[in-house]
Amino acid sequence: MLSKTSAGLFAALLALALSGSATAQQPAAAIFAERCAVCHDHPTGRTPARAYLLPRLPSEIVHALSRGVMRTQAAGLSQEQMGALAVYLTGRPLDSEPDAKANSCAARGDPPKLGPGQWSGWGGGASNTRYQPNPGFGVGDLPRLKVKWAFALPGLTGEPIVAGNTLFVASRLGRVFALDAATGCTRWAFETESTMRSAVAVGALGNGTVATFFGDQNADVRAVDAATGKLLWKTHADPYPNAMIVGAVTYHDGRLYVPVTANDEADALDPAYPCCKFRGGVVALDAADGRIIWRGYTIQEEPKPTRVNSAGTQMFGPSGGGVWSAPTVDPKRRLVYAASGNGYSGPAVDGTDAVVAFDLDTGRRVWASQALAQDIWLYRCEGKAVGNCPDPMGVDFDFTSPPMLQTASDGKQVLVAGSKSGIVWAFDPDSKGKLLWRTQISKGGPGDAIWGLAADGGNVFAAVSGPSTIGPATPGGVTALALTTGKTEWHTAGPTPPCAWGETGCEHRQPAAVTAIPGAIFSGALDGHLRAYSTADGKILWDMDTAGTYDAVNGIKAYGGNIDGSAQIVANGTLFVNSGNATATSPRRGDAVLAITVDGK
């Protein structure tokens, strides 16, 4: 199973996935060889190796092919062929998702309420600092933290969100569950027509209704009544055919700020694809009815015809600058900030790999502070100037975590963001994003600073995925930087315990988002361990191996695994953890949403 699989069982399942009867397996094998092998048998960057597909659920594979990022590669396949391919790759029969009615709450309970101690959106609020000032427990309670309950959610993705006594969790299979935060019983479940990757946001409408808001990979945004699960409205945020929403929407003062990116990086593998016409940006919606108020672009210039590629296809540019993470709202300056990704096609412009400021009321681009110029990159090009591939090829050093707006002890505000370069950047919001400092914390790569930093007013805290450039050159660890100067305050190298599932796929990198409370920060690792570190000196105060098997409250087994991507949040005295939220290149999936409290009470 997903949590305690030994190396021998892993090998046996792999043999099953790669062999099987000729009659049942050959069609799927041929499909894989024709459409998938070129990437998954020769993985680079974000591409998961073929063996990493084995622990996934067949339904995850089918969703990726039919609704998700692989839908272009799967074009023309029937549902039966997709199912056969999923069985071939995982070695398991097609599965079904958990029964949404299992362990339904006996009573509806009080409607969700907004207030201190809640956690909304990716960063806990519109400033995206990932800091919980009212955790409901203290540093002295850390040794007593124990699992209170577990919920099995195959395909779990966006981090847990809390409003009042309700916990909201989402699945990449397109389902959102509302659970009783105290017991884990199910209040309601909502299903979309697409895949999801991000957290939900919570906010109040003008009529007093508390709503949850979330986007999907079809670029649709929905508002759902937080008490009942009833759909209130649905809006298609961007008309571009490949547009998608993978970052959390941000709620502020009756409006939603929606990050938009696109799947062009993968689709441009086809030299017949006219790369590229997409510009990333932010869309502002009225939270009451979903009406589009404005749309702002990271790249100011509209794409125009540029060159004809080696296959004879007309190309367009500039393009790219997708926004992969939650926007950050600055009410004082009437701005909303977005962190942008690389360009897809030239000419190079200043809105890629940048922190971009938009007017909060109109969407006008006010300024852009670019960290890396000329970063034009497409998936699987690997420096080959053929087809749509850029020349020269960029390095894919996106800003992919939300910019944090943090106030220092002297009252000065600083914008901080991390990029895949392994660099943490600080910008001055009062000087059009002027660079204040930059600190290299790792060698950079696909897992570095992607998912989110945290700040407590004095320091910025960042987990390390690639080899550290501050401490020992080993993967994993946590670094604290002074908010106003970027000076390294401390670095704690990542421990390297054995993984609960054995040696295969056992890694100790720490790409997941970190979360801070007064006196401690939480950071998880790909080995399944969740640790609390002292904010003062980086000492490890608490360590829990989450990669176990749990009797879930919804009547099935839950399996822990990697801690990656969205990881943990703290609200109302409970530490909520996604164990097994592995991303594309994580080796070990699970499906456990854990509620951890003092003494498990």
Please tell me what each predicted stretch does.
Residues 225, 277-291, 351-364, 475-486, ...:
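Beta-propeller blade signature
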Residues 25-42:
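Sequence/structural segment immediately N-terminal to covalent heme-attachment motifs in c-type
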Residues 116-123, 154-175, 193-221, 244-274, ...:
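Repeat-blade elements of multi-bladed beta-propeller folds
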Residues 103-148, 298, 302-303:
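Blade/loop signatures of beta-propeller domains
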Residues 236-239, 293-317, 365-394, 440-443, ...:
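Surface-exposed loop and turn segments in beta-propeller and other repeat-based domains
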Residues 133-154, 310, 389, 495, ...:
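A short helix->beta-strand "capping" segment at the edge of beta-propeller domains
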Residues 38, 47-93, 255, 335:
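Extracytoplasmic electron-transfer domains, predominantly the class I c-type cytochrome c fold
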Residues 146-148, 185-188, 230-234, 293-294, ...:
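A structural motif specific to WD40 beta-propellers
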